[in-house]
Amino acid sequence: MATILVDVVSAEASIFSGPAKFVALPGESGELGILPGHTPLITRIQPGAVRIEKEDGSEEFVFVAGGILEVQPQHVTVLADTAIRGTDLDEAKAQEAKRAAEELMQNQSSDLDIARAQSELAVAAAQLAAIARLRRKK
């Protein structure tokens, strides 16, 4: 079967680089599925799990806190604001981030502070959803 080269990078590090049969990730309008030969595309991505189906059929999960997706017919690049390997996700840390964001929303008065708290809450909720999804896969 044909493959597509996938690179998932953040400002801190390259998280994944290798061939894949399929990539799924959260786009602005819903879940995007990318196969080899896909039409070129550039779009923003939402916080959530990137699922990479490797050549051998195994899956790799990477949590991204938003970013940009570039698709070329034989190459997918995910430029993530923050990226964490699925195996490195910490549920307790994500729960604490969610609690802190909810508390921030209650105690903020300016629209900018509320928007920042909402963004942090969305990332924490997406991280918890990614953890739950990983548990179901095991």
From Swiss-Prot:
SUPFAM superfamilies: Epsilon subunit of F1F0-ATP synthase C-terminal domain, Epsilon subunit of F1F0-ATP synthase N-terminal domain. This is ATP synthase epsilon chain. The gene is atpC. One of its GO terms (molecular function) is ATP binding. Its main location: membrane. It comes from Cupriavidus pinatubonensis (strain JMP 134 / LMG 1197). The keyword Cell inner membrane applies. Keywords: ATP synthesis, Cell inner membrane, Cell membrane, CF(1), Hydrogen ion transport, Ion transport, Membrane, Transport. Belongs to the ATPase epsilon chain family.
